[in-house]
A protein has these predicted regions:
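The feature marks the mature, well-folded catalytic cores of soluble enzymes
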Residues: 1-231
Length: 231
């Protein structure tokens, strides 16, 4: 088992190094080097990364790509706005049964939903119960501006099935955690994460006749709540 873990670390390290080569020599825009908790960078990103214009550019690129891949997004400031936005998304979609990850912010928002919702606890939730959920709520640790992709790390929260099984996935992402490229994002992924989930819009598949079907192998809809720091 030890040799297997060492081999996995070596492979992931090689992938990170190769993907980040293209990003060397340019400053990532609007991104803090790491975040142990959503929206709380652990280190100073430097003057170039802190510039509001640069950060605005990378957020704009990200939202443009979200729209291009069929995802929806809403900018919110603080937990109160996020709670209202979450309730609105679920109500508009007719989603009643909701499960949230173990991330503290997600737990706070899901537990605050009104009586019109059935709030499922992730702890002890059966496979059948998970498939009966209308929506799954998680955080995303990183966003990739080039492709409108969400990056979810296994070391940060229990979220993998919640982002894949329910027909609606709602992800909370700090605007300070949006990277330019996949290489930038992987350079910031926690070494403790054994699995990384990359989500680019709702699930899509097509047959040999190129008939596109949405939601067969994953969520039919992806909503991203972009959290900005309150002034």
């Amino acid at each position: 088992m030890r040799r297997s873990n060492e081999a996995r670390r070596e492979i992931l390290s090689a992938i990170r190094e190769n993907l980040t080569r293209s990003a060397r020599g340019r400053e990532p825009r609007g991104i803090a080097p790491g975040s142990a908790e959503l929206g709380k960078p652990t280190a100073d990103p430097g003057p170039a990364a802190r510039g509001s214009k640069e950060r605005g550019d990378v957020v704009s690129s990200f939202t443009e790509q979200l729209a291009a891949v069929g995802a929806h997004w809403t900018v919110v400031r603080g937990a109160t706005e996020a709670a209202h936005a979450l309730a609105g998304i679920l109500t508009a979609a007719g989603a009643r049964r909701v499960a949230g990850s173990d991330a503290p912010l997600v737990q706070r928002l899901v537990s605050g939903l009104g009586d019109g919702f059935v709030r499922e606890s992730l702890e002890g939730l059966s496979r059948a119960g998970l498939f009966a959920c209308d929506a799954g709520v998680t955080t995303a640790q990183w966003g990739i501006a080039e492709t409108g992709t969400l990056v979810l790390e296994s070391a940060r929260e229990k979220n993998r099935l919640l982002s894949l099984v329910p027909p609606i996935h709602v992800a909370l992402l700090s605007t300070s955690c949006i990277c330019d490229s996949l290489g930038d994002a992987l350079a910031r992924v926690s070494r403790a994460s054994h699995a990384i989930t990359l989500i680019t819009g709702p699930s899509r598949t097509s047959d040999i006749e190129l008939t596109l079907v949405v939601g067969v192998h994953g969520p039919q809809a992806v909503h991203v709540l972009l959290l900005e720091e309150e002034p």
